[in-house]
C-alpha cells in the first residue's frame, strides 16, 4: 500500500550537548532516537514511557527476551535488536505498525510470531544468523523476501479463524431520532447505502494489513450479503458492484428475498470486450417489490455530460470528461400495501405516490475536489430533470400538497462534511469561486447544471432546487470509510424536505472494539469492506385524505 517517504536514521548518530547558556535562554532539547549498549541483560520499564521515540538501537547487548510492553513505543519506525541472545519475540510486536525497519540478526530465534505479518509498512526485516526453519529462510532469500515473508505470516496468523467466531464486533446500536407523525397519513420505509469494495480494488498493495484470504471476494461476499440481509432494508443502494457479481450474486440472492434491482457499470464498460466488461464496477439499486413498483430507471454518465456541456472549458474537458463515474436513479411507485401498513388505514383516492431513489459514486482522488463538485452538480441537475419530467407527464395523478416527487439520494461522494460537495447539497448551492474549484475556469459550463434552469446563477452562486438533509448529522457516524491511511465520512444518505423525515439510523461500529482488537484499518477478517454501511428509517408524509365537512381526516394509528 502507499507509504510515506521513509528516511532511515543516520548511522553516525551525531549528537550535540546543550550549553548552559542555551538552557538558560529556554532552548528545548529534542531527541527522537535512543541507543542502549554495554552488554545489557534487562531493560528498565521506564523505557516504555518514551513514546516519542522513532528509533531504538539495542544491538550488541545480552538480552534474552523483549517485554511485550515494547509495543507502547507506537511511534518507532526503526528497531535494532541484532547481536543479542533473544530466543522469542512477543506477539505484541506485530502491533507496532509504524515500523519500517526491524533488525533481528544474530539472535537465537527458532520461530517468528505470525503477528509480525501485521507490520505491513515494514520495508526491511533482517534475520541473518538465526536458527530459523528452512521455509522461513527460503522466503527471506526470494526477491522481495521481506514482503513475501510478511504475507506468509499474516496469511497464517495463528488463531485468526477461531477469533472470527468468538470476537465478532458488537451489534451496532439503533438510534431513534424522532417519533412518526401521528397527525397525518405517512409511509415508512428503510434505506441502506453501502460501498461493498469491488474485488479488483481489494489488493494487498492497498490493504497490506489484511490477510490475502480475507481480501478474497469469495470470502468477503458472504459477510457482505449477510450484512445487507440483516438490515432487511426496503431500498438498498450499493457502490463498487462488479458487473458479473451483480448478475450472478447480488441479483440472485436478493431476488430470492423479494427484491428487484437496477444496475449500470462505469462508462468505460462501453469500450470493452464482453470478458473485460464483467469486471467493471458500477452502482446498483434494489427495492422490495411488495412495497414498490418500478416506473422508470435512468443512468447518468458524467463524462458524457461533461462533453456536451463543456462550453469551451478546458478544465471540463481535461479533468471531468476523463473520469468515468456514473450515477443511477429509479422512479418508484409506492404500493398501496406499504401505505396501508404505515398509516393503519386503507389508502383512498386514485392518486399515485412516487419517489425517486438516486445512487452515485464520485471520483476518488483528493486532488480532484473540483471534479467531485462538478459531478455532484451534474447529478443533481439530471435528477431534477427526471423529477420535473415525471411530474409533468403524470401531474394529474402524482402531485399532492407537497408539490413534487420526493428524493432519496445515496452516494459515496468521496468528500468530507466540510467539502464543497456537501456544502452544495446541504445548503442548496455553492459559490462559483469556491476553493474546491481550484481557481479553474468552469463558470460558463457550470450554469448549465443549475437546477433552477440554465443561466440560473444568482450572484455568483450555483444553486439547486432541492431542500436536502442528511440522515446522519451531528457526528452520529464518526467515519464511514476506515483504512489505515484515512478515516472519515465520505458516504451519505440525503433526502428531500419537507416530504421526508428521518426516524432512526443505524449507529457506528463500536470504536472500543476496533481499538481493543488493534484494528488499524478495514477490510479485516471480521469486516468485509473498507466502508461501513449506512441504514436509515425514513417517513414519507402523504397527502391528506379527502375532506369531510372541511376537515382533513388523518389515517388511524
From Swiss-Prot:
Give the cofactor note: Binds 2 magnesium ions, but the ions interact each with only 1 or 2 residues.
Q: Would the keyword Amino-acid biosynthesis be found if you checked this record's keyword annotation?
A: no
Q: Which ranges does the UniProt record give for the LRR repeats? A: 52-73, 75-96, 98-120, 121-143
**What cofactor does this chain's UniProt record say it requires?**
Mg(2+)
Annotated keywords: Activator, Cytoplasm, Exonuclease, Hydrolase, Leucine-rich repeat, Magnesium, Metal-binding, Nuclease, Nucleus, Repeat, RNA-binding, RNA-mediated gene silencing, Transcription, Transcription regulation, Translation regulation
Q: Which family is this protein grouped under?
A: Belongs to the CCR4/nocturin family.
* Identification of the protein by name: CCR4-NOT transcription complex subunit 6
Amino acid at each position: 500500500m502507499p507509504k510515506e517517504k521513509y528516511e532511515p536514521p543516520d548511522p553516525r548518530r551525531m549528537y550535540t550537548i546543550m550549553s548552559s547558556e542555551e538552557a538558560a535562554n529556554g532552548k528545548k532539547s529534542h531527541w527522537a532516537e535512543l541507543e542502549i549498549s554495554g552488554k545489557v541483560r534487562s531493560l528498565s520499564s521506564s523505557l516504555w514511557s518514551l513514546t516519542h521515540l522513532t528509533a531504538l538501537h539495542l544491538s550488541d547487548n545480552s538480552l534474552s527476551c523483549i517485554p511485550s510492553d515494547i509495543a507502547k513505543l507506537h511511534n518507532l519506525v526503526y528497531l535494532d535488536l541484532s547481536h543479542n541472545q533473544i530466543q522469542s519475540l512477543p506477539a505484541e510486536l506485530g502491533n507496532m505498525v509504524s515500523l519500517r525497519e526491524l533488525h533481528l540478526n544474530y539472535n537465537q530465534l527458532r520461530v517468528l510470531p505470525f503477528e509480525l505479518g501485521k507490520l505491513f509498512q515494514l520495508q526491511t526485516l533482517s534475520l541473518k544468523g538465526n536458527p530459523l526453519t528452512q521455509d522461513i529462510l527460503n522466503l527471506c532469500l526470494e526477491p522481495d523476501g521481506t514482503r513475501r515473508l510478511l504475507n506468509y505470516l499474516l496469511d497464517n496468523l495463528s488463531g485468526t479463524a477461531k477469533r472470527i467466531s468468538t470476537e465478532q464486533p458488537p451489534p451496532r446500536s439503533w438510534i431513534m431520532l424522532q417519533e412518526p407523525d401521528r397527525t397525518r397519513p405517512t409511509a415508512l420505509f428503510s434505506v441502506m447505502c453501502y460501498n461493498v469494495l469491488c474485488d479488483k480494488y481489494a489488493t494487498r498493495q492497498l490493504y497490506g494489513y489484511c490477510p490475502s484470504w480475507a481480501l478474497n471476494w469469495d470470502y468477503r461476499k458472504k459477510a457482505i450479503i449477510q450484512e445487507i440481509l440483516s438490515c432487511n432494508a426496503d431500498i438498498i443502494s450499493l457502490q463498487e458492484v462488479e458487473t458479473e457479481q451483480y448478475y450472478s450474486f447480488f441479483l440472485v440472492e436478493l431476488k430470492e428475498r423479494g427484491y428487484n434491482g437496477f444496475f449500470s457499470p462505469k462508462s468505460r464498460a462501453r469500450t470493452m470486450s464482453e470478458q473485460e466488461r464483467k469486471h467493471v464496477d458500477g452502482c446498483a439499486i434494489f427495492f422490495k417489490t411488495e412495497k414498490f413498483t418500478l416506473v422508470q430507471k435512468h443512468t447518468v454518465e458524467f463524462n458524457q455530460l461533461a462533453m456536451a456541456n463543456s462550453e469551451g472549458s478546458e478544465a471540463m474537458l481535461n479533468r471531468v470528461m476523463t473520469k468515468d463515474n456514473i450515477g443511477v436513479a429509479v422512479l418508484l411507485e409506492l404500493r398501496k400495501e406499504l401505505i396501508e401498513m404505515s398509516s393503519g388505514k386503507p389508502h383512498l383516492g386514485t392518486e399515485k405516490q412516487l419517489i425517486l431513489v438516486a445512487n452515485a459514486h464520485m471520483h476518488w482522488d483528493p486532488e480532484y475536489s473540483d471534479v467531485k463538485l462538478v459531478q455532484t452538480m451534474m447529478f443533481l441537475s439530471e435528477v431534477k430533470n427526471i423529477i420535473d419530467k415525471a411530474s409533468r407527464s403524470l401531474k394529474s395523478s402524482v402531485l399532492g400538497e407537497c408539490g413534487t416527487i420526493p428524493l432519496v439520494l445515496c452516494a459515496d461522494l468521496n468528500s468530507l462534511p466540510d467539502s464543497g460537495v456537501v456544502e452544495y447539497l446541504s445548503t442548496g448551492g455553492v459559490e462559483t469561486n469556491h476553493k474546491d474549484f481550484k481557481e479553474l475556469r468552469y463558470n460558463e459550463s457550470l450554469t448549465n447544471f443549475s437546477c433552477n434552469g440554465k443561466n440560473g446563477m444568482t450572484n455568483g452562486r450555483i444553486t439547486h432546487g432541492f431542500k436536502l438533509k442528511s440522515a446522519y448529522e451531528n457526528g452520529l457516524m464518526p467515519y464511514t470509510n476506515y483504512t489505515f491511511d484515512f478515516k472519515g465520512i465520505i458516504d451519505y444518505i440525503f433526502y428531500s424536505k419537507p416530504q421526508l423525515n428521518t426516524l432512526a439510523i443505524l449507529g457506528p461500529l463500536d470504536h472500543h472494539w476496533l481499538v481493543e482488537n488493534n484494528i488499524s484499518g478495514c477490510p479485516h477478517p471480521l469486516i468485509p469492506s473498507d466502508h461501513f454501511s449506512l441504514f436509515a428509517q425514513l417517513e414519507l408524509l402523504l397527502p391528506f385524505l379527502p375532506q369531510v365537512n372541511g376537515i382533513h381526516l388523518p389515517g388511524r394509528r
